[in-house]
């Protein structure tokens, strides 16, 4: 990998990680479009450490509060009812599905799942679900304005309404992102909207939930890369990770403002257009579905 490639791929990772359009799909497609070798699942996992560092910085106050409350809940029973302590436990619970499935499906993630036809189909499929969830959320918001904000009857939920059941559902939605094209934020936000959480609450928990999974995945890939016989261009990879982190922070700040007043339809349209284009190019033989594959 050249330094130029690493900068471009870092920009792509940072721009797409937190938007519901799939960073892994865009890294794969960028490499194909430029005629580069597929950077692979390991590169994606390591560069995601950069974007998750952006999450740690952006949500630092929330994270410090949650970690502090969760730690206290381990020692003091009375602290277990604290909302932040509860959030800590729910982030852990929601991280279990992707941890188990990530290890179980590792060979598929690094191989068959990177087929451009599958990526195109998941781009389109999740777009349809996101559109339905967005419309569902809009109707719930309208109902919320008419019935008031009393907990007993409010149709829109916030983070303090999270339950173990909801946390697990979020977790399984996150696990779908093991397939390039799904999008971690897209899947979890879609799940959250269907569970009747507000757009802001769905996005915030989505970003917090990703922290353990992404950092663990990146650390695991770092140990794998360090095995004898493995090869990695450390300089370009580190540069891509730094670029992804800086750009990712700016994207989080923009996205959290965007979703408070706008719908997800621009992302839905983009996903369908991109997925349809990739399918057409593969269908007409312009693109090889395994072009630039890591196993070539």
PLM segments and residue spans:
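Multi-pass membrane proteins that catalyze or facilitate reactions on polyprenyl-/lipid-phosphate substrates
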Residues: 1-296
């Amino acid at each position: 990998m050249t330094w130029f490639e690493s900068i471009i791929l870092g920009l792509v990772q940072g721009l797409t990680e937190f938007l519901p359009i799939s960073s892994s799909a865009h890294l794969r497609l960028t490499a194909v479009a430029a005629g580069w070798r597929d950077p692979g699942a390991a590169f994606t996992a390591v560069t995601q450490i950069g974007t998750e560092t952006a999450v740690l910085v952006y949500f630092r106050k929330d994270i410090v509060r949650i970690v502090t409350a969760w730690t206290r809940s381990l020692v003091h029973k009375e602290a277990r009812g604290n909302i932040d302590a509860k959030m800590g436990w729910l982030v852990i619970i929601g991280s279990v599905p992707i941890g188990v499935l990530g290890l179980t499906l590792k060979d598929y993630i690094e191989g068959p799942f990177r087929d451009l036809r599958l990526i195109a189909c998941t781009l389109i499929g999740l777009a349809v679900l996101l559109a339905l969830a967005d419309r569902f959320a809009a109707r719930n918001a309208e109902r919320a304005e008419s019935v008031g904000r009393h907990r007993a009857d409010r149709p829109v939920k916030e983070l303090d309404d999270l339950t173990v059941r909801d946390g697990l559902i979020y977790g399984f939605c996150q696990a779908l992102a093991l397939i390039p094209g799904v999008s971690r934020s897209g899947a979890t936000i879609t799940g959250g909207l269907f569970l009747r959480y507000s757009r802001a609450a769905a996005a915030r928990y989505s970003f917090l939930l990703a922290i353990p999974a992404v950092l663990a995945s990146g650390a695991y890939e770092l140990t794998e890369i360090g095995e004898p016989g493995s090869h990695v261009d450390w300089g370009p990879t580190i540069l891509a990770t730094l670029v992804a982190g800086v750009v990712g922070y700016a994207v989080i700040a923009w996205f959290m403002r965007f979703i408070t007043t706008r719908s997800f339809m621009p992302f839905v349209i983009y996903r369908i257009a991109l997925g349809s284009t990739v399918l057409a190019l593969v269908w007409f033989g312009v693109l090889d579905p395994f072009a630039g594959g890591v196993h070539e």
